[in-house]
Swiss-Prot record:
It comes from Rattus norvegicus (Rat). The gene is Adora3. One of its GO terms (cellular component) is dendrite. One of its GO terms (biological process) is positive regulation of mucus secretion. CDD domains: 7tmA_Adenosine_R_A3 (cd15070). One of its GO terms (molecular function) is G protein-coupled adenosine receptor activity. Residues 40-50, 109-128, 201-233, 287-320 are cytoplasmic. A lipid is attached at residue 305 (S-palmitoyl cysteine). Signal peptide: none annotated. Keywords: Cell membrane, Disulfide bond, G-protein coupled receptor, Glycoprotein, Lipoprotein, Membrane, Palmitate, Phosphoprotein, Receptor, Transducer, Transmembrane, Transmembrane helix. It is found in: Cell membrane. It comes from the Eukaryota. Pfam families: 7tm_1 (PF00001). Testis, particularly in spermatocytes and spermatids but not in spermatogonia. Low levels in the brain. This is Adenosine receptor A3.
Length: 320
């Protein structure tokens, strides 16, 4: 009887997990496609920072389209070849690191904007932006795919079983030493600390500029006022990323020391990490005025079935 109850509760946990993953994936895809559409339509948002925001949105769309379906497949523990399971698990990691690298790029860009106000446009050329974006994604793929090049559990599994197939589960193929020391500490925790320091310096610079006697320099005060609001909004995006990803990272860290973690805690940690991908569009809508205005224009246009010409004219009115 007790075994039946355990099986039933495990089944309900799996059904609930899959349902919530599907809902999160749908919201992440729709919300972040809307973010990209907003940047495409609103010319005033085509700045360096928003190129990096689009990069972050692409990573979040990939979470909805690729990561969540693969996470569901991995949770079902389907029987497959070791390297097929490992590749699926690595894909989950690639887009996590794409998000953190995009956030780092955004932080560096905002820092350059307030630190090198006059030289900013000459430093952040179009070519350098694309090079930096390419570097961010290259690092993400290299870090995420590292287990494919040998840092995995194949040798451990070969010692315990002769078959090359297994019930695919993330921890069956990816070692906790990689997850804790390389993926988390080196490529998530350290960048998070660096970004916090960058934002603290940004706020310090802006506060100093605003506290100076800038009588007669209204434009300068207005510039730093806008930068302060934007920095606060983007720091909130960073804070939410940390809030969503640290619980799962802490679970992995604790598990490394052979502490048994309840299955429900693991599921909640995974769901929270994936939920981060649907939060950013909401933050932009609430905190960035131009985003909010363009969202409303798009929603109004969709409701009234407007043509692209009328949509453009409405956008011109909002940007004036």
């Amino acid at each position: 009887m007790k075994a039946n109850n355990t099986t039933t509760s495990a089944l309900w946990l799996q059904i609930t997990y899959i349902t919530m993953e599907a809902a999160i994936g749908l919201c992440a895809v729709v919300g972040n496609m809307l973010v990209i559409w907003v940047v495409k339509l609103n010319r005033t948002l085509r700045t360096t920072t928003f190129y990096f925001i689009v990069s972050l949105a692409l990573a979040d769309i990939a979470v909805g389209v690729l990561v969540i379906p693969l996470a569901i497949a991995v949770s079902l523990e389907v029987q497959m070849h070791f390297y097929a399971c490992l590749f699926m698990s690595c894909v989950l990691l690639v887009f996590t690191h794409a998000s953190i690298m995009s956030l780092l790029a955004i932080a560096v860009d905002r820092y350059l904007r307030v630190k090198l106000t006059v030289r900013y446009r000459t430093v952040t050329t179009q070519r350098r932006i694309w090079l930096f974006l390419g570097l961010c994604w290259l690092v993400s793929f290299l870090v995420g795919l590292t287990p494919m090049f040998g840092w995995n559990r194949k040798v451990t599994l070969e010692l315990s079983q002769n078959s090359s197939t297994l019930s695919c589960h993330f921890r069956s193929v990816v070692g906790l030493d990689y997850m804790v020391f390389f993926s988390f500490i080196t490529w998530i925790l350290i960048p998070l600390v660096v970004m916090c320091i960058i934002y603290l310096d940004i706020f310090y610079i802006i506060r100093n500029k605003l506290s100076q006697n800038l009588t007669g320099f209204r434009e300068t005060r207005a510039f730093y006022g806008r930068e302060f609001k934007t920095a606060k909004s983007l720091f909130l995006v960073l804070f939410l990323f940390a809030l969503c990803w640290l619980p799962l990272s802490i679970i992995n860290f604790v598990s490394y020391f052979n502490v048994k973690i309840p299955e429900i805690a693991m599921c909640l940690g995974i769901l929270l990490s994936h939920a981060n991908s649907m939060m950013n569009p909401i933050v932009y809508a609430c905190k960035i005025k131009k985003f909010k205005e363009t969202y409303f224009v798009i929603l109004r246009a969709c409701r009234l079935c407007q043509t692209s010409d009328s949509l453009d004219s409405n956008l011109e009115q909002t940007t004036e």
